[in-house]
Amino acid sequence: MSKNVVIIGTQWGDEGKGKVVDLITDKVASVVRFQGGHNAGHTLVINGKTTILHLIPSGILRNHVECLIGHGVVLSMSALLKEIAELEVADIDTTKRLKISPGCPLILPYHIELDNAREIKRGKAAIGTTGNGIGPAYEDKVARRGLRVSDLLDPNLFASKLKEVMEYHNFFLTHYYNANPVDYQTTLDEVLSQVEQTKHMIVDVTEQIHQHIANDENILFEGAQGALLDIDQGTYPFVTSSNTTSGAAVTGSGIGVTDIDYVLGIVKAYTTRVGGGPFPTELIYDVALDKGDEIGKVLGTVGHEFGATTGRQRRCGWLDMVTLKRSFNLNAVTGICLTKLDVMDTLETIKICTSYEIDGVETTIPPFSAEDYAKAKPIYIKIPGWKTSTIGTDSFDSLPVEAQSYIRKIEQLANLPVDILSTGPDRLQTLILKHPFE
């Protein structure tokens, strides 16, 4: 019997979702992206070769897998074509297996200009967006003025709609942000030339998904970013512009709620965050100044904690079970995939945050506001480190006893099983204790 599995990052993104998606797609007919845009990077390492994807589902490296981009994704045609070209250079064919929903909102040049103009105007209060136009594109969608992939199929209608919406946005760019306007004709010509290269990929993705279900075929739904960046449930306003929880798989693809059989929550063995926002367990280290917390330095250096999309340094800290337990509930997580355990191989002692102290009161419930988060002081339990390499370990029993204890403690605190364990960046450096599709 087939299964529909959702993979979700349970923290602030960068948990290692791409590798895990690629690994378990050996058993699927299709992989579906359902939210976000090209603001997130999924890094895959196969036989030592690194591939970074931003828009295209991570199943593209499997020749038998169909890759679907659902209507919940905001789509930059420029970014998509760039990614396709990079894959073709690596002899990975996308033309027959990549499909795009006509309902995808388009990211256009004025969205990017607005994104960057806003960050400049915010100054020190900048959110830390990737500057790729994701937020403004989602705003247009909600305001019902956004252009969608389906609009491109009628060039005359698209030209008319584009002119109207560009007049609106150029007014704000010039009069409020003191920025340069975006040229209408240049934008129109660029986008219409791009659609000729992608027209054959546009299909009814929702119908495609239900055909797979009718044919009793496995489907994997690939989340981007992390649940704690969710526009509604995250650390607002330091969040992304889409819903990043497992529920977005339903709204962003068209699968029914009761059709989801399993949710795999990806958990990094420590915590990272890019950009601004609350981070109670942060171990502050500035890579440019080579100054700050030494363990924060180890986690960032050994873990190569630099963004796949922006190259920005990721903030690092201890595992935070307060936020994680909320995330597990939000996503109805079935099982955990624990990643980057090997990054902590050299540490003498490891800490896990199990509660916060806020205004002198201990709590295991995460605060609602960013202001209260800023006052949260982490309360830790300590676990002995294992001080030996776990890279490429081929069985759970082969792990150091202390590493096993760390994993068991996470399972105990989460009340969930660790079904997959990543012990290195390569596809093969993974222990599947229970396969989500079995």
UniProtKB/Swiss-Prot annotation:
One of its GO terms (cellular component) is cytoplasm. Its main location: cytoplasm. The keyword GTP-binding applies. It is found in: Cytoplasm. The keyword Ligase applies. Pathway: Purine metabolism; AMP biosynthesis via de novo pathway; AMP from IMP: step 1/2. It comes from the Bacteria. Keywords: Cytoplasm, GTP-binding, Ligase, Magnesium, Metal-binding, Nucleotide-binding, Purine biosynthesis. Binds 1 Mg(2+) ion per subunit. SMART domains: Adenylsucc_synt. InterPro entries: Adenylosuccin_syn_GTP-bd, Adenylosuccin_syn_Lys_AS, Adenylosuccinate_synth_dom1, Adenylosuccinate_synth_dom2, Adenylosuccinate_synth_dom3, Adenylosuccinate_synthetase, P-loop_NTPase. Substrate binds at A308, T309, T310, G311, R312, Q313, R314. Plays an important role in the de novo pathway of purine nucleotide biosynthesis. Catalyzes the first committed step in the biosynthesis of AMP from IMP. Belongs to the adenylosuccinate synthetase family. This is Adenylosuccinate synthetase. It comes from Ruthia magnifica subsp. Calyptogena magnifica. The lineage of its organism: Bacteria, Pseudomonadati, Pseudomonadota, Gammaproteobacteria, Candidatus Pseudothioglobaceae. The gene is purA.
